[in-house]
Structure formats: structure tokens, C-alpha cells
Amino acid sequence: MRNSTFKFPMKKIVQIYLILFFGVCINLNSQSKGFRLIGAQNSYQDISFQFINNLIVIPIQVNDKKLNFILDSGVSKTIVFNSSRADTILSNFQNKYKLKGLGEGLPVNAVISKNNLFKINNLIAVNKNVYVVLKDDFDLSSKMGITIHGVIGYDIFSDLILRINYKSKKIRFYNPSQYKQKICSKCEVLPITIFQKKPYIDLSLKLNNNSKIIPIKMLIDSGGSDAIWLFEYSNEKIVTPENFFTDFLGVGLSGTVYGKRSRISSLGLGKFLLKKPTVSFLDTLSTKEARRFNKRNGSIGTGILKRFTVWFDYPNNRLMLKKNNFFNEEFNYNMSGLEVVYDGKILVEELSRNYSRGRGETPDPNGNRNYIRLIKSYEYKFKPNFKINDVLKGSPADIAGVMKDDILIKINGNPAYNFQLHEIISIFHKKENNLIRLTLMRNNKKIKIQFNLKKII
């Protein structure tokens, strides 16, 4: 969409630095009102969320339109993508901004939309500012399998206490003035620091069994699907282990992000100790803006957080954790080397079997006049289509011959359109040596490829 579609003054160009990997950080001085529970008797509000690719997706009504937002504690301002539709939802566009994304590419343009109304059941935020990315090809939706309109973070965390239950997929938003913290002997309460509208926590790690414990300061990033990101050499002891491989980590506004994926011996969160977590080491160039807070050593994402029921308590600068049934699950990763994305819809012919009952005039040899008749018919339905967006060099899929832009037809004998995207991705995270059988379409020809999942780290 051309910038001219938005009617905003061009008097002022502001340089902003944004860091995005399903998480965003913008440094701005403008203020907008946070969320409040309406109704004097309302001490909390419960909502359900979708948990897709290790990310929380919540429905928010924006100016009477229902939109899907990723809940991202690493976001200092609310961001909306897909500018070609934004002007049908938002209004009052002002000022053009330059956003610098994670990666090595160039900044992208955005505009601010003011005085918007946000509503989540009994949670209301008025006069909210929204930043609209003027780049339609930045498409989170294709990587999530559902439409994602934006990301929201500090604006919803700042004035409420959130309890996130990853097992039940529910969030409870508490009114801080009416919240009473219960005694929980199985919980761990950890202090957090809010710096530039983002939460940081002091943790500890061991790179290997023989190394010493290293104290680290980490961003708490509910919008990061990985377990741990570490900034290489942010501490002289933080170096990539010998056993690693280069992996696709995500897409920022400024391009694709890769890192060195490995494992460390353990991560300590107070009294909780997580063993053998996966970790991605990022270099200085791709994380230049993220390192502006020079005390930061990296971030913990949902790969860690989902193992707990988590209380985010910004008003009291604390985080409370209670381990859940996911705590002891093995830390796995995509062992196929494939990045699969949603690629629109296709029309599929499906066989429908119906039965009709009746009573005939002439009885059968047993004197029975009743009958059941099978009626076959065909229905045409739109189903999701998936394609291969990237293949890691040297991975099992690469060695087997899978190529970028191949269309995914079948997985292990089942039509790909019967899966949701996150279900396909989860297949590649399962046990080592699992056989993966793919039917692909390439240049209008069907090809069959198979390979075994291989654990490198």
C-alpha cells in the first residue's frame, strides 16, 4: 500500500529502533492510557487464548473490529501489521517513523494512529496509540497459520496483574488494587526490573557440567517462541559450545534471523532448575539494537515460560512461577530443517457418505421391508495450503532433496490440508529417527521424499 493512503502530516520524521522476533521494542516518549477493568465489582477478568507455535494469541476488539494479537512482554508499544487493511480499522494517522528491525536489513516505515479504543470483555483501554507498519510483505500470519494483526505488550501488562496458565490456555487479568497474593509454598517469587517498558530478570546458567555458574540478566519475552537466546560475548564466559548448528530463528522487520543452536547444562530460575535446555546464540550484528541495554545477556522465551503457571506483576515488580506438567518435558527443536508456511487456500473435493432409511413395497427373502441405502456425493471445500519456505543446508530434509517453494501435499500419508500449521511443525519436533514421508508438488509434478529426524545437539 502506498503511503499516500494514510493522511498524515509529513513535517516530522522520527527515527525509532525496533527489535522484533515475535517481540518488539520501541523507544518512544508518547503516552497512552493502559487497560482498566470496568465495573466496581470486577476484581478480575478471564479470557481463553490460542497457543500456536509457542505463542499466545488473544482476541482484542479494536474500534469494533475483532483482531488477533500476539501477547508479547517484550513489546513497549502496540504494533499493527498489514497496512493495506489498517485504514479500515484505525484512523487519525499522524507522523511517519523509521523502524529498525532485528536482522541486517534496512529500516521500514510506520505511522502512528491515535485515539483508538481497545476492549477485551470487561477490560477497556481508551485513547490508545497504535503503530502501523507500512510493509505488507511482513507477514506473521503465514508463519502462524491464522491471521495475526499485531502484537501487544506493555500497554496490557503495565497496570494489571496477569496469571497465565499455559496448561488450560487461560489468562486471568487482576485489578491490582483488589488482588491479594495467596501463600504458595510451591511457587517462586522473583524480582523483576522494568527498563524502557520491558521486564528483565536475574537468572543463572551453566554452559556445561564442568563450568561455573554464570549470573545473567535476561529479557522476559513471552513473544519469543524459543527457550533461550544468548548474546554471544555479552559476558566473557558466554560463548557458543563446540556442538552447535546454524538454525533459522525467525523473521524481523529487517530480514531473516539465524543463530547458532546448541544446548547448555542448566538454567536456574530461583529454586527451579531446568536441565539441558536448547539455546540460540546470536551474533553482535543481528542484535545490535537489542544490545543497547548493555547489562542484558539475552532473553527467555515461551520455551521456558510454558513450563510454569506465570504471574506477571509489573505494579509490584515481581514474577511468580509455579511449575506445571510441562516442566519435565524434553527441550526439542525442529529436527527436519524445514520451515513450512501457510500459502493461502485451495479448493478440495471431498467424498461425503450419507445413509437414507426407508420401507420398500416388496419384502426381502426374510420378509423385511426396511432398507438402508448408502448415498455418495462430493463436496467442495476451501482448505489450507502449505509450502516449504526454507530448507536448512545439510539438514535431513535438504539431504533428501526437499527444496524451497515445494508445495506440501501429504505428510506421512495424510493430506496436508487436514493439518493446522502448528500441527505440522510439531511433527518435526518429535522423537529422533522418526520417519517423515512427504508428497510434494514441484513444477506441476508430484514427488515423494522421505527422511528420518536427526538430533544434532
Regions found by a protein language model. Give the residues of each.
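Bacterial Sec-dependent N-terminal signal peptides
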Residues: M1-F35
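Pepsin/retropepsin-fold aspartyl endopeptidases
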Residues: L28-I457
